Amino acid sequence: MTVVLDHLAIGTPTLTDGWELFGGVLGGAWVYGGDSPGFWWGQLEFAAGPKIELMTPAGGPDAAFLERFLATRGASPHHFNFIVTDIEATLARIRALGIEPVQVNLANPYWKEAFLHPRSAHGIVIQVAQQAGSPRVAAPGELPEPGPSALFDLIEHRVGDLSGATRLFREVLDGRLESGDDDAAELAWPGGKLIRLVREDGLPLGGSLHHVRFTRADGAFSTHDKERAGLLAKRLGLTVELAGP
């Protein structure tokens, strides 16, 4: 069984800011997307690192979960997704850690999924999914041409219980411990995917996504890029660090 960090999902009432930031500024290229009950989603990939998924409500009773999220928090990071090869074995690992998954749905042979509530997952929803095949949908017309290529090379997540969070991401979600001490731990997955866990007390639900980092493989981000990215990221409830040579 393998578990791989696949994407960071962001809930938003409008997709334009996300397309401009992650596509136009940060060079994300369309992968796929489509309709799910109550919401539409689309994913962009980068030169390395996890994908970004944008989610927006599509109306109807099934949209209530995302509408509530946006009403409470506004546009902001919604979940981490991990793709697994054996979801039942992953669920057994999760339960062995004393965590009970929620919204477990194994009925669809093409997409089996379960979630960890933020109270159990150190401040953010975690989705684990077993996927068979990928939907092929044309890129949205409003998606800009990708900007210069960038690497999505870090997610920093602050947690109150560093030891417990490290166990979850390492023992259940197959993160390889790259470094760690009493204050922080870095875990990696294939494809240049890196989560840094940093201890911080007093966080709601025991954790909070602090920032993400993108690095240009060739050349530095311009002052205009940084200003534009900062404005767009703020609208998405996200802090983006731009790095370069």
Predicted regions and their residues:
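Core segments of cupin and vicinal oxygen chelate
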Residues: M1-V3, A9-K51, A89-K112, L116, ...
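Vicinal oxygen chelate
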Residues: V4-P13, G42-A47, I52, F65-L151, E178, D182-R199, ...
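Anionic group-transfer/hydrolysis microenvironments
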Residues: A9, M55, N81, R119, ...
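A short alpha-helix capping/helix-coil boundary motif
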Residues: E20, R68-A71, E145-P146
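Conserved donor-binding loop and adjoining core beta-sheet/short helix segment
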Residues: Y32, P50-E67, R199-P204, A243-P245
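Generic hydrophobic/packing signal
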Residues: A58, N81-V84, R95-G98
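Short, flexible helix-coil linker/hinge segments at the edges of structured domains or between repeats
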Residues: A58-F69, A132-E142
